[in-house]
From Swiss-Prot:
The keyword Transmembrane applies. It is a multi-pass membrane protein. InterPro entries: Na-dicarboxylate_symporter, Na:dicarbo_symporter_sf, Ser_Thr_transp_SstT. It catalyses: L-serine(in) + Na(+)(in) = L-serine(out) + Na(+)(out); L-threonine(in) + Na(+)(in) = L-threonine(out) + Na(+)(out). The chain crosses the membrane at residues 24-44, 48-68, 82-102, 142-162, 194-214, 218-238, 292-312, 319-339, 365-385. SUPFAM superfamilies: Proton glutamate symport protein (SSF118215). This is Serine/threonine transporter SstT. It holds the Pfam family SDF. Its main location: membrane. The keyword Transmembrane applies. The gene is sstT. GO terms for biological process: cellular response to iron ion; serine transport; threonine transport. HAMAP family: Ser_Thr_transp_SstT (MF_01582). One of its GO terms (molecular function) is neutral L-amino acid:sodium symporter activity.
Amino acid sequence: MAFGKSLFHAIGRVSLVRQIAAGLALGIVIGSVSPQLGLAAGLFGSLFVGALKAVAPVLVFILVAATIAQHQKGNKAHIRPIIVLYLIGTFSAALTAVIAGMVFPTHIVLAGAGDVSAAPPSGIVEVLKSLLMNLVANPINAIANANYIGILAWALVLGAALRNHGSDVTRQVVADLAEAVSTVVKWIIRFAPLGIFGLVSSTIAETGFGALAGYAKLLAVLLGCMAFIALAVNPAIVWWKIRRNPYPLVFTCLRESGVYAFFTRSSAANIPVNMALAKKLGLHEDTYSISIPLGATVNMGGAAITITVLAMAAAHTQGIQVDFATALLLSLVATVSACGASGVAGGSLLLIPLACSLFGISNDVAMQVVAVGFIIGVIQDSAETALNSSTDVLFTAAADLGRQRNRAE
């Protein structure tokens, strides 16, 4: 018993990032050496992601409602500058992907269209309609289905009603509930090393490394664009807001948010992680409690890259010459489409046919490109989610720190 306690204390003294690195390394070894054991260990990953996905909608709803209910008149949440950064970042990602697609034209071997079962949206109007319908969804269904647009809408409305008509006791109860749910999130995050061990070992056991070799160039363009956005474009945007070296903040967000998101492959599951990081950075709670759930829905730079690169690859594969005007239009369409990716089953991949339609590519060919996307998804989806989710907290921090700098001047 004493040995067990001392072991737990010893583990507790090791930083969470180092524990995650150890879980990652062990997962690679187990998944490679014993695929059967790796698949069995996947249960830990499923439980971890399931717990995060379960608590995230409740956390967002209660935290946003509590923030609005406690909000004092005269205080501002300063959401608009963050939304502007989200849009600038997403458009920059799409434009970068267009340029990369023209400089490094990629041809792909198309997979069978039968590999894709879901139906893509028929146009941009359907994407926007999906977003608006999510806005007015039943609040219970919104929480149950992790519809964050609906959750935000109802939390804002309920919080405003409590602020104007609720008693002090009622508002305090909601605030206490928010604190309690945040504590539960901290407990879940402590299991991240075990969860990531399970996710990595099962992924390697299922796919290995050989399945991705045939699409090496496509993956190189995709990951290169995402790395360029994360390490060059985003830091430039952050510098514009805070006017000092952005890289300490950038690397903090990548390390403490991006790593989680890479392995969970879910922006929704990463919301509690981003909330905890925003609190650790000392950001304004009225701001991040709204901007981070919103970012998980509309800040989709990684999705814009995926849509654009695969659409450009489809055009090159079909022998279609893409002029600059069409490429610029593709950037705009990818930006708007990416912002609606969370409202579409299948996410960014199922919006590729919409982008392909700009080039007159048939839906049959476009769906084969989507099938290729699913093949490389083990890497593409992880990197895309890491970029999307880490950028949520990065831009929130940049806007908040920039506002503090302006106020100090």
